[in-house]
Amino acid sequence: MRKQRAGLPPDARADPEHYRSRASHETYRELGERARDELARTGGAIVDATFRRREDRDAFTAAVGQGARSPVFIECRAPRDVLRERARRRESDPRSVSDATVDLVDRQLDEWDSLDEVDAARHATVRADRDPPDIVDDIEAFLDQRTASGVLRFG
């Protein structure tokens, strides 16, 4: 989304300025609008973003709207050294389209705002330093539990 908003091709590296506060606010607002439209069209949407600042989450949530279709936040956590190593691998891979650098990872972790404002029924934390199938299993279990309890509705 950031690259699209900046008029960059998907395989270009975005300038760090595209990750600053004002640009992020607008990006998250637009992500929320797109998620809202997708929810109306298909009944579901998955948005992959850091949501590291409360103001970004607020912009996204305001654009999506409230009610049974309010956002659910899945917080994927991993140790700093794991995230830094992943960024190093992406930086050295000429085929990578990721903007992640070790400096960006460090800055984002240092600027992290906890999700205190998010209702526990709409927030799960999963360890992201495991095999992907295990992570997916945890996310599915969380969503299944919330759907069964009526917190979430799909379709």
Regions found by a protein language model. Give the residues of each.
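Hydrophobic helix-cap positions at the C-terminus of alpha-helices
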Residues: 38, 63-67, 115, 146
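Short, electropositive alpha-helical surface patch
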Residues: 53-68
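Small-molecule kinase domains that catalyze NTP-dependent phosphoryl transfer to phosphate-bearing small molecules
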Residues: 92-155
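Short, hinge-like loop/turn segments at secondary-structure boundaries
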Residues: 8-14, 64, 90-93
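Conserved nucleotide-binding/hydrolysis micro-motifs of P-loop NTPases
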Residues: 1, 51-52, 77-83, 130-132
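Loop/turn-to-beta-strand initiation segments
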Residues: 41-45, 70-72
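Conserved substrate/cofactor phosphate-moiety recognition/catalytic segment
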Residues: 1-43
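Conserved phosphate-donor/acceptor-positioning beta-strand/loop module used by diverse small-molecule
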Residues: 67-88, 126
